A protein has these predicted regions:
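Cytoplasmic helix-loop-helix junction between adjacent transmembrane helices
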Residues: 106-144
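Helix-loop junctions at membrane interfaces in 12-TM secondary transporters
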Residues: 10-11, 95-107
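C-terminal membrane-cytosol helix-exit motif in multi-pass small-molecule transporters
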Residues: 157-158, 177-198
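Juxtamembrane intracellular "pre-TM" segments in multi-pass secondary transporters
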Residues: 2-10, 190-222
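Glycine-rich segments within core transmembrane alpha-helices of 12-TM secondary carriers
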Residues: 137-157
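C-terminal ends and interior cores of transmembrane alpha-helices
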Residues: 84-99
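Pair of pore-lining "gating" transmembrane helices in MFS-fold secondary transporters
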Residues: 8-39, 110, 212-232
Length: 234
């Protein structure tokens, strides 16, 4: 029975891996163009990298709401809503570039970062769809999608840069929006899942108790250092 569950869950894993490749492409596009466009749109040079910072802040801010949304409504609805919101954010970014509006562009980067918080849940959905002994393989396949995105995202951005005359790179974000819509179509093929049952009596340890654990502190510090280094390199 476990073997049957592992085999039956693999189509979902491939769907999630494909969606990961499509959605992560938008993030890599912000990494590629965020600093360049920030330098062009920012009112002062010191704010040039704010779009990249906004994306990272969006990721941090979206983590807890994403978890609550999936618990209340299920993974599939949360995935679909997030992909749609990311496509809208790409349209906002394109409009901001055409209007030479810095703050709306930063807002779009923030929303795309928040979408990343949902995209990071794809691997866990993949692990839950197969037998426990195949969870590692499922997670690895989804993570390969990010490697594909590292190539696809910048390539799409460069090739569609002049799509809209007079607004360099606005077309890049429209193309990214199309990728998010493609991800939406892929995610719509996932089977419907039931939200977690919340009875109001609570369960598990309080977040404060978890945060006091040495292991939690070490994990948070490692994440802070890793993202700080990544942001510095970007």
């Amino acid at each position: 029975e476990k073997r049957k569950r592992g085999v039956e869950g693999m189509p979902q894993v491939w769907l999630l891996a494909s969606a990961q490749a499509l959605c992560a492409s938008g993030s890599f596009l912000v990494v590629l163009l965020g600093g360049i466009l920030g330098a062009e749109l920012a009112p002062v040079p010191g704010l040039s990298t704010l779009p990249l910072a906004a994306m990272v802040l969006g990721l941090a801010a979206g983590t807890v709401p994403a978890a609550f949304a999936m618990r209340r409504y299920g993974r599939r609805p949360a995935f679909l809503a997030s992909a749609l919101l990311a496509a809208v954010a790409c349209c906002l970014a394109a409009a901001a570039i055409r209007a030479q509006a810095f703050w709306p562009f930063c807002a779009s980067a923030f929303v795309l970062g928040a979408n990343n918080a949902v995209v990071m849940q794809y691997r866990f959905a993949a692990a839950e769809s197969v037998a426990p002994e195949r969870a590692g393989q499922a997670i690895a396949l989804v993570m390969v999608g990010a490697l594909v995105a590292a190539v696809v995202g910048p390539e799409v951005g460069v090739r569609s840069a002049e799509l809209l005359a007079g607004s360099r790179f606005a077309g890049s974000f429209l193309a990214a929006g199309a990728l998010y819509l493609a991800a939406l179509a892929v995610l719509s093929r996932l089977p419907r899942d039931r939200p977690a049952i919340v009875d109001g009596r609570g369960g598990g340890r309080p977040l404060a108790a978890i945060a006091r654990q040495p292991e939690f502190v070490v994990a948070v510090l490692a994440g802070v250092v890793a993202y700080a280094v990544m942001s510095f390199i970007m």
